[in-house]
Amino acid sequence: MKIELIIYVYLFICTGMIAFNIISVFVYHRRDIKTTRISRGFEETIKTELSNIKNGESVSENHLNYMTAALQREANMIAFNKVMDRICEADSQTVKAYLISLESVFVTVSEKYLRKDEIAAAYFPYIIGRYGILSEEPPEQIVRMLFVLLDQPSIYSRENAMQAVYTTGNTEYVVKALKNIDRGNHFYHSKLISDGLLRFKGEAAALQKKLWEEFETFSTEMKVTLLNYFRFSSGEYGDRFLTLMNDESQDDEIRFACIRYFGKYFYKEAEQALVFYADCDNGLREEYCIIASMALALYPGEQTVKTLKKNLGNRNWYIRYNSSASLEKLGMTYLDLIDIIEGNDRYASEILRYRFDIRNVIEEEREEESPNE
């Protein structure tokens, strides 16, 4: 009897799930139909305004009032997004002028969305950020809303708010937002920040200057994030990175970020320090040796090769791997390293054979592909 009861309960649950899925399909389909209908209405009126802008006219007051009333509903905001997604590429300059004219509309509806649930509230800055609706001096009301969202526990709210801040091109707002995140209690992945900074709509040089001015006011974690941003954006800060890298009072993570910077951008003055960090007998943490061994791929020289060859016999696999990769990038051939490959150090011999095996496989694949080109 117990088994039969369990089976009946299981069948009841399965039936309920199937019914739920069927109902959901119908509900979502009906919602899509409604959104499509609203989108068509938006598209007609928006295209009329775009035509007026092309003729040198401004967006009509009636249209602004209509959009103010319509965009207070989430379904209409979704429909608006679909319309703009379709027409944005048609005439970007005219569309940009139209979107900027909607700034007053978004000021009015911002307070409405701030009082909605976190998903709806997060969608508002998403639209602002996606279409670059804000100017460099955005309305205070919207800025205030964005900074409120930066303190929300939802990562969607915080990330979308940051994306909207980046589109303003205002360095003051970006730095202020970064400080809010830095002092907040919510986790914010560093890659989201560094990638977001790369999408900053203003002058990158102005933003970088401002970040360096405020650099010491940030926590260690945020400093590392900013250093990563500099690594991805500019090779003009070798002197600053060298000073930080050689400053023993700095946190290790900051110095690691500096070593990675010199692994991306050649800076002659950093070569001697990198050789020192790549020496596994320097008394420092192993991470220095691991990262510096990879960075030395940009610094050909007798001392570099000597240090990397020595590292091939290290017990740490990452040190061996990075050293072998750097030697390969420096142009070392099988014959150049034959003494190690055929030597008694099994660690060094195996990692080099591994590297050359990989290279041979890649070369064979290229040869097979070349006749078909």
Predicted regions and their residues:
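Structural detector for internal amphipathic alpha-helices that build alpha-solenoid repeat scaffolds
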Residues: K82, A90-I100, A122-L134, E159-T168, ...
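Long, charge-dense partner-interaction scaffolds in eukaryotic RNA-expression machinery
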Residues: D252, D281-G283, R320, R346-Y354, ...
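N-terminal signal-anchor transmembrane alpha helix of single-pass membrane proteins
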Residues: M1-S39
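Short inter-helical turns and helix N-cap capping residues of alpha-solenoid HEAT/ARM repeat scaffolds
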Residues: K116-D117, P153-I155, N185-H186, F218-S219, ...
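Long, acidic/polar, low-complexity amphipathic helices and coiled-coil-like
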Residues: E111-R199
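Amphipathic alpha-helical repeat scaffolds
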Residues: K47, N81, S110-L114, L146-F147, ...
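Amphipathic alpha-helical scaffolding segments comprising HEAT/armadillo-like alpha-solenoid repeats
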Residues: H63-T68, I100-L114, E136-L149, N170-I181, ...
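N-terminal topogenic membrane-targeting module
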Residues: F26-R115
